[in-house]
Amino acid sequence: MILLISDLHLQEERPDISRAFLDLLDGRARHAKALYILGDFFEAWIGDDAMTPFQQSICQAMRRLSDSGTAIYLMHGNRDFLIGQAFCDAAGCTLLSDPSVIELGGEQVLLMHGDTLCTRDLGYMKMRRLLRNPLSLWILRHLPLSARYKLARKLRSESRTQVRMKSTEIVDVTPEEVPKVMAAHGVRTLVHGHTHRPAIHKLVVDGQPARRIVLGDWDRRGWALQVDEQGFQLAPFEFS
């Protein structure tokens, strides 16, 4: 069994989500061969050198799962792209490139966070290119902690404002982009998060039937994609 989740947006202000994640680590994930976390794991991350006690507790719980035999793979999201190798080493997880192709359920599957599919959101795409270039990343990681905290708060505030102002079509994936990206990677299944619109979409790629599986965000309930001998099963679960 393989589990895939995304968009937990872990933060101290939402202990219900944190407890649900810890329950997953101590429960279903213990029986999984691997756990994939496809971005926006934390609501914000300003650097491995600035871990709070809350974030350290999450890291330690992940390490326990990893030590028990479940492999953990973590992909950057738009909220936590400053997660680095130091955190991954401590948590016992592998940092996964976005995009990545893996073998899943007997086929090659493309994994993405999903934000790069939203090409109609021109303002966001411009900001992403700016923040993700190597020079910007180096500068961000070397800013004083106070400056990083201030910048993180500013970006989160602006992000919420922009999402409210923009149409749902703009902040969703661009329909034409999906088959193009899937064809470029030679896959018929894509799994991503980011949009907070869990669903399984059918489409055609290079004349062949294909599917796009969108993971759900954790808010009032959690979401997980389970892949086993029964196939691909996307389902919500209630927080205990």
Swiss-Prot record:
Q: Which UniProt keywords apply?
A: Cell inner membrane, Cell membrane, Hydrolase, Lipid A biosynthesis, Lipid biosynthesis, Lipid metabolism, Manganese, Membrane, Metal-binding
Name the pathway it acts in.
Glycolipid biosynthesis; lipid IV(A) biosynthesis; lipid IV(A) from (3R)-3-hydroxytetradecanoyl-[acyl-carrier-protein] and UDP-N-acetyl-alpha-D-glucosamine: step 4/6
Membrane topology, as annotated, equals: Peripheral membrane protein
Q: What reactions does this protein catalyze?
A: UDP-2-N,3-O-bis[(3R)-3-hydroxytetradecanoyl]-alpha-D-glucosamine + H2O = 2-N,3-O-bis[(3R)-3-hydroxytetradecanoyl]-alpha-D-glucosaminyl 1-phosphate + UMP + 2 H(+)
Biological processes per GO annotation: lipid A biosynthetic process
Residues annotated as binding substrate are: N78, R79, D121, S159, K166, H194
Q: Name one GO cellular component term.
A: extrinsic component of plasma membrane
| The keyword Transmembrane helix appears for this protein | no
> Which residues are recorded as binding Mn(2+) 1?
D7, H9, D40, H196
Point out the signal peptide segment.
none
Q: Enzyme class, one word?
A: hydrolase
Q: Name one GO molecular function term.
A: manganese ion binding
Q: Which InterPro entries match?
A: Calcineurin-like_PHP_ApaH, LpxH-like, Metallo-depent_PP-like, UDP-diacylglucosamine_Hdrlase
Q: Where in the cell is it found?
A: Cell inner membrane
Q: Domain of life, per the record?
A: Bacteria
Q: What is its EC number?
A: 3.6.1.54
Q: Provide the family line.
A: Belongs to the LpxH family.
What is this protein's function per UniProt?
Hydrolyzes the pyrophosphate bond of UDP-2,3-diacylglucosamine to yield 2,3-diacylglucosamine 1-phosphate (lipid X) and UMP by catalyzing the attack of water at the alpha-P atom. Involved in the biosynthesis of lipid A, a phosphorylated glycolipid that anchors the lipopolysaccharide to the outer membrane of the cell.
Q: Which NCBIfam families match?
A: lipid_A_lpxH, PRK05340.1
* Name listed for the protein in its UniProt record: UDP-2,3-diacylglucosamine hydrolase
